[in-house]
């Protein structure tokens, strides 16, 4: 068979019938290619989206860029602002420079080359004779004999006349401005009570620059304060550091909280937290949200930090993505939550934490929180038990133990303060913990916060550490240690010239400068003599060593006190002492009676063999009468905030009580403290100041015996006519007292003695009849000058009624109340903040005054006209009262002996 019949491949390809098939195949290939391209594009887009998330067009590029800039702020690590500057950021153009000549300067740091160990011990510190030049809001130079011809022609010269000059006082716990004085409901902004955790509130938003207390505080040399929210909740909010210069009179251009900021750049932020009793008391109520125990408080803290930590993580993740790939790399805005912003800054190390914590459990729990969430704490405030557990403080996160911001002697007012010690500062200093001293204004008047440091020194804290505790130490804790707290070139021009050693009792500023501007045009100045105090650590140790209490049976006590240097006893004037050193002065007590004061040379050979000798050391001692405490709850209350430790409070509707029936004197820490401070006797009124006062001995007669022995069961009749008496009104309370006194006058019989039944022996009228008929003291607790004026009218009306009794009172026992043949009731005012306004009237009426406390301030409305003393006022209430001839005493306080010292410290001539 031939192969010609078979088709060939070439022939088949050339046949015309095959052309349409060829066109079809080419079209399909193009489609395949197109599909492949589409697949590739889809894949590329998918792949691109897997690399960088797709950003929707709804996000604002401008806002994303702002968020990216915020990342830098979040990651910023603050540093203490440097001191060396051309001018202070708070300086106001046009203020003249000032040269302070002839000052005795406390620089605030040891001499160059002093080792850290020696500096801690107090070596290298000294007062130096120097001039200080202030310009552009700064300390420009410190040195001897600065020549005025080297200074600007418009320089102002202030002659310090050798007086001491220190840096301005720094109080790192104050509520000035947010708790203005006098306290009123409408201006109280210390605590935000809407929740237990309020880190988002700010003290500056409630700060009133017109709070007069800001000026009063400055008059004590305080130039800078940390204004904190209160301690009513566990996290109270953000705090701010202010200077005490407000408006044009103080050299400022405006009246505003912003203008008061100590560091306008706000290098650091601050926050207040609190542990313990306060949050439990405020929020610990059944059925309501809030902690009822310290366990609950720890949960509140940890839960809050957990929320803040979550926000920080989200922000860090967002910032990492945006910083790596730009704003196109993020799909959302930066996570932000104003509620947790401040706590987030705490966890980032941008906020100095200050925590109100008293007790060992509180301190230990809070230290645990710092380690769990990795944030530092700057200081524990109040901190009454820190001296017991310094090792716990040293476990706080960050490697730097927190400081302890303390009161010197204000303690025992509630359970968590009951273990406090007057030597806490000295103990903490020895343990390597920094003690600083604060006011908690208005709890204590910050005008006298330097006085807290003085008391700490008296209880063993070395001189340099005590003065640092209100200057350089708080400045450093605030992160402003190169700006304030020392007298060095480059520091802010915040300095104080004092009328005496600032750590002496009664010291007051002669002038205060803030940012180089003098704050007083014509300050009142107390003329005092002073000598440069020794700051040698060995001498300081002798001066502040704790004294041993000596208790001997008064009936058989045979004692010789050697080296008496001063006497303030009215029966033993200074003339009894020998001024020479060849014959040291001694005080001889034989069988419990004083037998000699002075050199006593004829007595010494005998008594040195028969008496116990008690040397008073190298610096000697002062002989005073024992003190009598009046005006406190001593003997009736152990812990003010714990009802179970108190006798209880009497109200206007309570039965008339006798304090002797509620005396709580056995095993009292309060009585022991009073005894250590020289108090021998006390007069206590029923709590609420309505009833009959009792007189008792603070110490027992024999060694180791408890106090509380009564020397007078019924020594006075007490009423209160202050804020608590306005039920229903103060006028009604005054009228009721008038009526009862007049009723008592009518109850006298012809002999002037009270008519009573056995049952009525202890009722109110019986005691008031003794007031009007026998001279029993009527003690009224009152502050307002208006109420005092009303009392003077009542006194006159009652005495007129007594005059009507006429001869019926002739020969009555107890003639102490008679004057010029007219019976007078013995009226004594306690508190008496505004008594100086009626000094002459009080003297004419024969009214005695017990100032309690001695140094009053306008804490309440009826104290608003108190005199604060130099440099603001020419004296205090006691000056006006003594000048008018009023009999004046000082009321009991936690530091009664220190307050008595103000009288000999130059505040009263």
What are these regions (language model features)?
Residues 170-172, 225, 271, 353-355, ...:
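Hydrophobic faces of well-ordered beta-strands that scaffold small-molecule active sites
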Residues 21-25, 42-76, 86-89, 94, ...:
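His/Asp/Glu-enriched, well-ordered alpha-helical/loop segment
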Residues 120-121, 488-533, 560, 568, ...:
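C-terminal cap of metal-dependent C-N hydrolases
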Residues 103, 132, 137, 162, ...:
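Divalent metal-coordination and catalytic microenvironments
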Residues 1-25:
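Short, low-complexity, Lys/Arg-enriched N-terminal segments of secretory-pathway carbohydrate enzymes
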Residues 46, 51, 70-74, 80-85, ...:
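Histidine-rich, glycine-flanked metal-binding segment
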Residues 26-36, 46-47, 213, 218-377, ...:
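Polyanionic/metal-chelating signatures
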């Amino acid at each position: 068979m031939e192969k010609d019949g078979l088709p060939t491949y070439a022939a088949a390809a050339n046949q015309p019938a095959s052309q349409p098939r060829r066109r079809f195949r080419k079209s399909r290939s193009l489609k395949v290619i197109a599909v492949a391209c589409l697949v590739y594009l889809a894949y590329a887009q998918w792949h691109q989206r897997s690399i960088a998330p797709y950003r929707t067009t709804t996000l604002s590029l401008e806002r994303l860029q702002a968020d990216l800039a915020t990342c830098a702020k979040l990651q910023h690590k603050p540093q203490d602002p440097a001191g060396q500057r051309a001018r202070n950021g708070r300086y106001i153009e046009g203020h003249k420079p000032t040269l302070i000549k002839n000052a005795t300067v406390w620089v605030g740091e040891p001499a160059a080359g002093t080792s850290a160990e020696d500096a801690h011990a107090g070596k290298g510190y000294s007062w130096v004779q120097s001039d200080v030049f202030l310009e552009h809001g700064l300390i420009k130079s410190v040195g001897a004999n600065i020549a005025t011809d080297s200074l600007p022609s418009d320089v102002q010269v202030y002659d310090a006349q050798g007086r001491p000059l220190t840096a301005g006082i720094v109080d790192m716990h104050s509520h000035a401005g947010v708790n203005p004085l006098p306290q009123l409901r409408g201006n109280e902004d210390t605590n935000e009570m809407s929740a237990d955790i309020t880190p988002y509130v700010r003290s500056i938003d409630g700060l009133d620059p017109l709070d007069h207390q800001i000026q009063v505080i400055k008059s004590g040399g305080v130039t800078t304060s940390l204004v904190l929210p209160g301690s009513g909740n566990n996290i109270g909010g953000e705090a701010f550091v202010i200077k005490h210069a407000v408006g044009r009179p103080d050299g400022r251009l405006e009246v505003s909280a912003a203008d008061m900021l100590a560091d306008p750049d706000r290098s650091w932020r601050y926050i207040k937290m609190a542990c313990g009793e306060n949050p439990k008391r405020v929020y610990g109520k059944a059925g309501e949200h809030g902690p009822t125990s310290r366990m609950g408080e720890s949960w509140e803290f940890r839960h809050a930090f957990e929320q803040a930590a979550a926000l920080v993580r989200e922000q860090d993740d967002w910032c990492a993505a945006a910083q790596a790939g730009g704003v196109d790399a993020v799909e959302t805005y930066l996570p932000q939550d104003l509620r947790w912003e401040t706590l987030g800054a705490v966890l980032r190390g941008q906020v100095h934490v200050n925590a109100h914590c008293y007790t060992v459990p509180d301190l230990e729990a809070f230290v645990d929180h710092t380690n769990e969430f990795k944030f530092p704490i700057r200081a524990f405030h109040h901190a009454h038990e820190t001296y017991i557990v310094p090792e716990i403080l040293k476990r706080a996160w960050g490697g730097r133990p927190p400081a302890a911001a303390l009161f010197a002697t204000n303690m025992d007012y509630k359970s968590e303060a009951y273990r406090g010690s007057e030597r806490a500062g000295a103990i903490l200093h020895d343990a390597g913990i920094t003690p600083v001293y604060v006011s908690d204004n208005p709890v204590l008047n910050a005008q006298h916060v330097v006085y807290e440091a003085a008391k700490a020194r008296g209880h063993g804290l070395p001189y340099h550490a005590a003065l640092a505790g209100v200057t350089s130490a708080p400045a450093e804790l605030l992160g402003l240690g190169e700006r304030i707290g020392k007298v060095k070139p480059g520091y802010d021009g915040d300095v104080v010239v004092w009328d005496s050693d600032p750590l002496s009792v009664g010291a007051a500023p002669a002038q205060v400068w803030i940012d180089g501007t003098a704050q007083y045009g014509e300050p009142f100045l107390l003329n005092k003599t002073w000598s440069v105090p020794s700051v040698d650590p060995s001498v300081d140790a002798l001066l502040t060593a704790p004294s041993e209490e000596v208790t001997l049976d008064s009936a058989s006590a045979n004692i010789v006190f050697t080296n008496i240097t001063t006497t303030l006893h009215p029966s033993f004037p200074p003339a009894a002492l020998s001024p020479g050193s060849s014959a040291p002065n001694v005080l001889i007590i034989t069988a419990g009676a004083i037998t000699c004061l002075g050199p006593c040379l004829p007595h010494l050979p005998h008594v040195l063999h028969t008496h116990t000798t008690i040397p008073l050391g190298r610096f000697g001692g002062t002989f005073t009468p024992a003190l009598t405490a009046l005006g406190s709850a001593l003997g009736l209350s152990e812990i003010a905030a714990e009802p179970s430790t108190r006798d209880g409070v009497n109200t206007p509707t309570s039965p008339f009580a006798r304090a002797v029936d509620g005396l709580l004197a056995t095993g009292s820490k309060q009585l022991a403290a009073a005894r250590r401070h020289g108090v021998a006797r006390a007069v206590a009124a029923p709590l609420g100041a309505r009833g009959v006062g009792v007189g008792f001995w603070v110490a027992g007669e024999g060694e180791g015996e408890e106090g509380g022995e009564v020397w007078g069961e019924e020594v006075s009749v007490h009423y209160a006519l202050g804020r608590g008496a306005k039920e229903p009104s103060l006028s009604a309370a005054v009228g009721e007292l008038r009526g009862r006194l007049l009723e008592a006058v009518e109850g006298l019989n012809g002999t002037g003695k009270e008519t009573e039944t056995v049952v009525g022996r202890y009722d109110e009228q019986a005691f008031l009849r003794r007031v009007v008929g026998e001279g029993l003291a009527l003690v009224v607790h009152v502050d307002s000058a208006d109420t005092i004026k009303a009392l003077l009218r009542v006194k006159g009306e009652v005495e007129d009624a007594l005059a009507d009794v006429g001869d019926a009172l002739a020969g009555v026992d107890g003639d102490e109340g008679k004057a010029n043949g007219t019976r007078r009731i013995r009226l004594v005012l306690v508190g008496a903040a505004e008594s100086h306004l009626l000094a002459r009237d009080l003297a004419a009426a024969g009214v005695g005054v017990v100032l309690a406390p001695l140094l009053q301030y306008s804490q309440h409305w009826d104290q608003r006209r108190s005199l604060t003393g130099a440099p603001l006022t020419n004296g205090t209430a006691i000056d006006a009262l003594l000048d008018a001839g009023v009999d004046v005493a000082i009321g009991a306080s936690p530091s009664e002996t220190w307050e008595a010292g103000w009288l000999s410290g130059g505040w009263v001539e």
